[in-house]
Amino acid sequence: MQMDNNRLDINEMMTGREYLDSLNDGRSVYIYGQKIKDVSRHPAFRNSAHSISRLYEALHHPESQDLMTSVDRDGYRTHRYFMPSPSGNELLKARDAIASWSRLTYGFMGRTPDYKAGFTATLGSDPHLYAPFHENALHWYRQTARKVLFLNHVLVNPPVGRSRAIADMRDIYLHTEKETDAGITVRGVKMVATSAVISNATFVAQNSATQYQIGREEDFALCFILPMNAPNLKIMCRRSYEASALSPFDNPLSSRFDENDSVLIFDGVFVPWENVLIYRDIERARNFYSASGFLNRYPLQSGTRLAVKMDFICGLLIKVLESNGTDSFRSVRTRLADIVALRNLMWSLTESLCLNPSDCTHLEDSAVSC
């Protein structure tokens, strides 16, 4: 712990090694019909896991720490996008922190930890949206910010019985099975959980297009956060592009940046009350996306990542044109200029998102967090 002008500066952010160790927590991961014991060493996941570990290492590097991190209102150092931004200029700094992380994967990993930070930071700025579970929201904001936890999300019901009511799909769709003083037990299937196998926890909710029947489908109106090693939670992975890649030289992207997608099976999973954000509340479950601020924040992360990817593509294209001697052709330069213009457009859009934010002055901690 350090003191900066009498202000706390507590650093509990995971290192790369701590992140890799956190994946070997007893979680139930299955791929090709086999249960995986060591995620960080398995050939289907190890390179992508180590790509993420580089992001965590960068948070502690002296040359990049001040660019990527800051101290939140509680005195804990965290990634700038994991905390609410009190001004447009601070949000622009968060954009630059996103870009710095994204450059480590050339913009090709879309669901890095800062993606879900677009949501978790709002838990700190507007916890009362989740009343009577507002203390849970604050708890999870603090947990994710202090450790810079890697969350995935799982929102979609399996694509079966689409013509039937949600209540008639109880044997498949995720729902509350039992309630006790300690928490709830849930059962069912959710998809598609991108990078679930290499993340720390999953955020579970319903897709924004879900239509509930009031008085009949309250058991399905849920929103909670769950560690990936929760008992009876099974992670069923698609085939691994990383495992089938010959080498980083032959397959430079799929060999290192494969964000494996999973189906999550909740086979009687216990969820403590402190992990619950919405429970049997159709109105809140229905309005969560528009009310929480996540829809406002996540485009900044995804747009910044695309801008970084465009940097890479433009640079690669210029090298190709130089190598084959066509870089001086006027028609080729015109086409190249079109692509560079798209690159410039993306950077301009992300800057505009930061400096012309939505008015969120009703929130207790941030004028622009939503």
Question: For each of these PLM feature ranges, what is it?
Answer:
Residues 4-58:
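N-terminal-proximal low-complexity accessory segments that begin disordered
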Residues 5, 29, 292-301, 326-333:
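Short, charged, low-complexity loops and linkers
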Residues 14-26, 277-288, 304-316:
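Acidic, low-complexity proline/glycine-rich segments
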Residues 46, 50, 142-145, 308-311, ...:
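Generic structural signal for well-ordered, non-transmembrane alpha-helical segments
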Residues 57-151:
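Internal helix-loop-helix
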Residues 153-302:
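FAD-binding core of flavoproteins
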Residues 301-360:
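Extended amphipathic alpha-helical segments enriched in small hydrophobics
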Residues 363-370:
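Long, low-complexity C-terminal extensions of enzymes
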